[in-house]
Amino acid sequence: MTRKSIAIDMDEVLADTLGEIIDAVNFRADLGIKMEALNGQKLKHVIPEHDGLITEVLREPGFFRHLKVMPYAQEVVKKLTEHYDVYIATAAMDVPTSFSDKYEWLLEFFPFLDPQHFVFCGRKNIVKADYLIDDNPRQLEIFTGTPIMFTAVHNINDDRFERVNSWKDVEQYFLDNIEK
């Protein structure tokens, strides 16, 4: 039997990128922004006057290297690899300076994944997997397999896709019905 494949986004799915951006912007501009303030919006729409600072933070060398891993992501992804071909599909073209940081981060926190399964791209319609777990509705819209939205503060009002709220939900979605 052929194994199904799952492509997984990195930012806001495997890694808490937004939390780190908010911390850095708050520190540099003394803002005090809380995650809850986004309420269905992107950070750049909540503080448009600081869009340049957000870009500066994202382009800072090392930014993507030190992100926190989302709770349970490592253990669930490892379990998924026992039954599925798992790929990491990250839109690194949005921040071209992020390539090496993202690669090193993936090697450190997901050492059980084959680096040949890391896909650094722009638009994820090039990824030919059975499933895509992503927080970005634009990427899910163009994906040709089954799109699964990973909940993030900016997408909470989007109901166009099947949704998982956490890595425990991902585990339940993909592994609960696997025959043992």
UniProtKB/Swiss-Prot annotation:
One of its GO terms (biological process) is pyrimidine deoxyribonucleotide catabolic process. Its cofactor is Mg(2+). Gene3D superfamilies: Deoxyribonucleotidase, domain 2, HAD superfamily/HAD-like. InterPro entries: 5'(3')-deoxyribonucleotidase, HAD-like_sf, HAD_sf. Coiled coil: none annotated. Pfam families: NT5C. Mg(2+) binds at residues 9, 11, 135. It is an enzyme of class 3 (hydrolase). The active site is at 9 (nucleophile), 11 (proton donor). Its EC number is 3.1.3.-. Signal peptide: none annotated. GO terms for molecular function: 5'-nucleotidase activity; metal ion binding. Keywords: Hydrolase, Magnesium, Metal-binding. PANTHER family: 5'(3')-DEOXYRIBONUCLEOTIDASE. Belongs to the 5'(3')-deoxyribonucleotidase family. Dephosphorylates the 5' and 2'(3')-phosphates of deoxyribonucleotides. This is Putative 5'(3')-deoxyribonucleotidase.
